[in-house]
Amino acid sequence: MPYVRYDKFREYFNRHNKETNELGKGKNNMNALKTNAVLQNGKYCIEGVLGQGGFGITYLASQVALNRKVTIKEFFMKELCNRDEQTSQVSVPSMGSVDTVARFRAKFVKEAQTIAALNNPHIIHIHDIFEENGTAYYVMDYLSGGSLSDLVLRDGVLAEATALGYIRQVADALSYIHARNINHLDIKPSNVLIDGNGNAVVIDFGLSKRYDETGSQTS
């Protein structure tokens, strides 16, 4: 594992201890799919909204056949997209925004493909990706522990041993992707979730960049 300035990581996490994690707050969900909406011909059933950002809505859902909880992220640019309440179809009302939305949707799909190719216990796992309702979705593990940001807001300053454990796990994830010429570029407490075993898991590769062997950016 590369040398890590643990004091700098801890300072960074503490500096962000008031940041609100988008997951679990259920805000800004006026354009979200309704509870009990189904996707992929009933394969997935929406249970509720976990959060919404500028580029997507995150849902808690059930994978019906396997009887398990999953997280589904839907591409939805809330400033540029509309949803038909009856059909759930997503549209772009302004013709001038169509190309912009298409470009960012392609990036959303690329993000999912990037994560799906990774295999590290401290990086979120993606199980499925599909298009429906005029937009794109990908399906991830559901992690019930909330984010590192949530943890600090709830419990206050972490014990040193706990903080160092999370830092080492995040560093392991970063070392893994750096070895594959990927930079995450958006590591912060709200992008580190805690799984059911108390381990840190890195999410949200929306700003990530991939480089070739010469150091030139490829995505």
Regions found by a protein language model. Give the residues of each.
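Conserved N-lobe loop of protein kinases adjacent to the ATP-binding glycine-rich P-loop
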Residues: 62-69, 76-80
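AlphaC helix of the eukaryotic protein kinase fold
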Residues: 84-117
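Activation segment signature within eukaryotic-like protein kinase domains
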Residues: 166-167
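Protein kinase catalytic-loop region centered on the HRD/HxD motif
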Residues: 172-182
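Conserved short submotifs of the Hanks-type protein kinase catalytic core
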Residues: 133-147, 151
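Activation-segment/catalytic-loop signature of the eukaryotic protein kinase fold
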Residues: 129
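Protein kinase glycine-rich loop
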Residues: 47-53, 58
